[in-house]
């Protein structure tokens, strides 16, 4: 990735100006986009999207479990999110005897809905710009404290936008009595698993259904049998009319992280160092876990959520690198920066300062990422930390220990430790005297790992109960890792570019860009705050001679169905429904066939955190549940290209079809108004 005169000539006109469907917009400022939205098929007003004076669509959107989105679809707090967003909760409720991951779960009444310990959802009350309050000397902590005192269950955050050029206060109501209502079998909800993840065409019924409960005053409350279904200010009406190519779509959700304004230095680090290293490390971890899961149903359940979490980013990073290379993102950044230099010679020092700051911090940030991908993944050391946590009572400590061992296998952890200690030893860019001494004492990283697991007495709950944690070899290891962690966590920021030494130059740089590039539509990077994105249903040209249509159907599921492959072994009930064409009201005529729609794609700008987001038509009605992007679209966190980037949506008609024909839970339809 070297700068060349040829590239500068070819790309001198390159800009990162607004493309038709690019952007993740703050809903409180959506009035600036309404004219464009209406020209593309939106029928409502800005007040319908976001209002603090009346119920609006924002009141039906939830931040689910701290990292996903969900949508409320009834007057009784029923909400839909992705299966992969509810996966941890479903897995925690599952046992070998009651395997809800494999078999699914469907409550047939409110009484059968299962409490999900620790699961929380947040509903936005309002957002306020507080840039001036901070400039006047008020602290973030003071602003948050005042906001949280306003109501029962209020939680607040102050988030920076445009690298600190603006700041907003977000006030939420936090609900922590959330119960599982329904989840399809994994071979529907995760159909295709890692093989199909980030891939189009897609046939995954990636949804799960929960319900929010509140106290008698409709306020957030801890779990109680006396709690009642929450009555939201607004819920989404469901449309079963379907979609066609060109239809308007809108996403309302909590995108987690984008890097729209990073420079070529950061793109080079991501594509050539960070992503390739993390991909290789996670490949090792997935191979170890996958081999163990094949040998034992118990291990498969224990490590199901862990495996899914590791695999998701692993495949995403692969697509990100491919997309960056395919679009020439690095070269475009170089050319854009050169245009900025030429147009703003008095501000060219900002790019020089950014480049110097990157050079100062790249090794430290790489070490943080290496620690996160290697040492952090060795689980047994957590027992040491729990045992030493003085904030816990004896009862709380034992409960935490029991929860840890519930989903732990010491033989799997041993293999992971061997692989990750060797990898850390190979790639480390910082000194680690304590760990290096342990390696040297036992004859190397692998030898030390084997010695550690041969001699620890913490390998199982039963062994733990009679062990002395303070003198156990795992404690010695945990202390050695803590030395590394203290250094690594100095660089624990969302992205490399958010390290203060780098970010301090981004604030004036982005401000200068906004003053200079008047053709570019600027929006704040995603940071897990509520955003609106809009686009249209559209296929795309995947490769030369290969056009991907925007809709998939049940026929694609049957073509992939394979009883010999776990991830494609669909429930027999679905085979039976297909064989008899017992589709009920969910059957449609499409391209001359009687079928059931499954998924579709659109041009909405999305990222992680948008999983589970409501996908709405021009009337603000729910037409699908967002759950993924196409593989090459994963680079849209850095560069969005409308010709290539597509988000993947589970058609709401397939959700309802599965609820009805597979789950037999049609009792939910009345409250959803279907």
Where are these regions (language model features)?
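Sec-dependent N-terminal signal peptides
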Residues: 4-13
């Amino acid at each position: 990735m070297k700068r060349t005169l040829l590239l500068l000539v070819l790309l001198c006109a390159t800009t990162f100006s607004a493309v038709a469907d690019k952007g993740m917009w703050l809903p409180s400022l959506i009035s600036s986009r309404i004219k464009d939205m209406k020209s593309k098929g939106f029928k409502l007003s800005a007040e319908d999207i976001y209002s603090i004076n009346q119920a609006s669509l924002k009141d039906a959107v939830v931040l689910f479990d701290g990292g996903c989105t969900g949508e409320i679809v009834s007057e009784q707090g029923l909400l839909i999110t992705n299966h992969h967003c509810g996966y941890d909760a479903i897995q925690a409720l599952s046992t070998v005897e009651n395997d809800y991951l494999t078999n699914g779960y469907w409550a047939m009444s409110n009484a059968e809905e299962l409490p999900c310990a620790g699961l929380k959802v947040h509903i936005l009350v309002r957002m306020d710009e507080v840039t001036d309050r901070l400039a006047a000397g008020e602290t973030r902590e003071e602003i948050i404290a005042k906001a949280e005192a306003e109501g029962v269950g209020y939680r607040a955050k102050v988030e920076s936008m445009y690298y600190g050029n603006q700041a907003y206060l977000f006030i939420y109501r936090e609900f922590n009595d959330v119960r599982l209502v329904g989840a399809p079998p994994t071979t529907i909800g995760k159909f295709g698993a890692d093989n199909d993840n980030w891939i189009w065409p897609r046939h995954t019924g990636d949804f799960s259904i929960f319900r929010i409960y509140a106290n008698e005053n409709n306020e957030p409350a801890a779990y109680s049998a006396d709690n009642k279904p929450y009555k939201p200010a607004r819920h989404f009406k469901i449309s079963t009319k379907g979609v066609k190519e060109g239809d308007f779509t809108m996403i309302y959700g909590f995108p987690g992280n984008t890097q729209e304004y990073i420079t070529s230095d950061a793109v080079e680090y991501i594509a050539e160092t960070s992503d390739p290293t993390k991909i290789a490390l996670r490949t090792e971890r997935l191979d170890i876990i996958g081999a163990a899961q094949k040998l034992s149903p118990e291990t498969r359940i224990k490590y199901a959520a862990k495996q899914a979490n590791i695999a998701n980013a692993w495949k995403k990073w692969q697509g990100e690198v491919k997309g960056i290379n395919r679009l020439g993102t690095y070269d475009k950044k170089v050319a854009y920066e050169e245009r900025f230099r030429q147009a703003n010679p008095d501000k060219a020092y900002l790019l020089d300062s950014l480049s110097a700051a990157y050079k100062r911090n790249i090794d430290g940030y790489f070490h943080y990422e290496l620690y996160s991908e290697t040492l952090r993944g060795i689980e047994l050391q957590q027992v040491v930390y729990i045992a030493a946590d003085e904030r816990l009572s004896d009862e709380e400590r034992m409960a935490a220990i029991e929860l840890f061992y519930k989903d732990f296998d010491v033989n799997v952890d041993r293999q992971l430790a061997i692989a990750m200690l060797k990898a850390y030893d190979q790639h480390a860019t910082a000194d680690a005297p304590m760990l290096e001494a342990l390696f040297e004492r036992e004859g190397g990283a692998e030898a030390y790992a084997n010695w550690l697991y041969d001699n620890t007495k913490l390998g199982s709950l039963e062994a733990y109960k009679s062990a002395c944690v303070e003198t156990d070899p795992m404690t010695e290891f945990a202390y050695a890792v803590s030395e590394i962690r203290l250094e690594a966590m100095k660089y624990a920021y969302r992205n490399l570019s958010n390290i203060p030494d780098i970010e301090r130059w981004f604030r004036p740089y982005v401000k200068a860009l906004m003053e200079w590039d008047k053709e570019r539509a600027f929006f704040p990077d995603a940071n897990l705050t509520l955003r609106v994105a809009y686009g249209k249903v559209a296929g795309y040209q995947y490769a030369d001679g290969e056009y991907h249509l925007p809709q998939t159907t049940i026929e694609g599921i049957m073509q992939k169905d394979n009883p010999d492959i776990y991830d494609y072994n669909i429930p027999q009930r679905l085979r039976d429904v297909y064989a008899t064409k017992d589709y009920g009201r969910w059957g449609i005529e499409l391209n001359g066939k009687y079928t059931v729609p499954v998924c579709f794609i659109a041009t909405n700008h999305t990222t992680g955190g948008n999983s589970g987001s409501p996908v709405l038509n021009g009337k603000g009605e729910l037409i699908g549940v967002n759950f993924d992007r196409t593989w090459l679209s994963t680079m849209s966190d850095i560069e969005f290209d409308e010709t290539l980037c597509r988000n993947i949506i589970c058609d709401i008609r397939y959700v309802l079809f599965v609820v009805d024909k597979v789950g037999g839970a049609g009792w939910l339809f009345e409250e959803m108004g279907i």
